[in-house]
Amino acid sequence: MSQLKELPFSTLQFYATAPYPCSYLPERQARSQVAAPGHLINADTYCQLVQQGFRRSGLFTYRPHCDNCQACIPVRVDSVNYTPNRSQRRAWKAHQGLRAFVAELAWSPEHYSLYTRYQQGRHPGGGMDDDSRSQYAQFLLTSRVNTRLVEFRQPEGQLVMVSIIDVLDDGLSSVYTFYDPELAGSLGTYSILWQIEQCRMLELPWLYLGYWIKDSRKMAYKAGFLPQERYIDGQWTAPE
């Protein structure tokens, strides 16, 4: 391990993982840089790490650290000046009937069932479509920071979507969203729009969306939420 000198945390270190298959670009190998020790990453520290391009998966805080590749670009949406495009306005209107319930992280068989159906319907063969209960809980229900679970339900009570969101000093970080794969409409888009509205209500300037990859169809949607900034060469800048 070596000192993470670019961050103002004298006690934090980082390590690079071994190469593993990239989930987004075929025939590529990925690596991650993981901040450690995890128990020292509290809400304040985590906020500063996110501002440096890090993300969270369970108790692991990481950012891409790939050999000869910088395709993963952190993205954050300017919630104050955000203006929806036509398809985003349609998504917002289509799902206005959903009711959102904000809660703390907790195990629920209903949530796990929806998560399993989402993975099997949207990402079959992706490695997460057979996650056990413990894997699901480690991924989404384990956190040392200020995290909320948001249920989206139909008026009659049917659960259709769940979002995991971290609350930061300067914004919200959209950790993960899963939804009923059999329902038509842009539920994922609606979740992002709902989070932008929450940023505005809380007077938080940014919604962090994780990584955008130009050549990945899975990530293309993130470029459509404007205005936004991208973290390139250690600086947040607006795309040209």
Curated annotation (Swiss-Prot):
In terms of Pfam families, this protein maps to:
ATE_C, ATE_N
Query: Looking at its record, which EC class is this enzyme?
Result: transferase
Keyword Protein transport present in the record's keywords: the answer is: no
The UniProt entry's GO CC annotations, sorted and at most eight, read:
cytoplasm
Q: Where in the cell is it found?
A: Cytoplasm
Reaction(s) catalysed (UniProt annotation): N-terminal L-glutamyl-[protein] + L-leucyl-tRNA(Leu) = N-terminal L-leucyl-L-glutamyl-[protein] + tRNA(Leu) + H(+); N-terminal L-aspartyl-[protein] + L-leucyl-tRNA(Leu) = N-terminal L-leucyl-L-aspartyl-[protein] + tRNA(Leu) + H(+)
Q: Name one GO molecular function term.
A: leucyl-tRNA--protein transferase activity
> What EC number(s) has UniProt assigned to this enzyme?
2.3.2.29
Q: Name one GO biological process term.
A: ubiquitin-dependent protein catabolic process via the N-end rule pathway
Per the record, the domain of life is: Bacteria
Record keywords, A-Z? Acyltransferase, Cytoplasm, Transferase
Q: What does this protein do?
A: Functions in the N-end rule pathway of protein degradation where it conjugates Leu from its aminoacyl-tRNA to the N-termini of proteins containing an N-terminal aspartate or glutamate.
The entry sums up its family as follows:
Belongs to the R-transferase family. Bpt subfamily.
Q: This chain belongs to which protein, by name?
A: Aspartate/glutamate leucyltransferase
Organism of origin is Bordetella avium (strain 197N)
Gene symbol here is: bpt
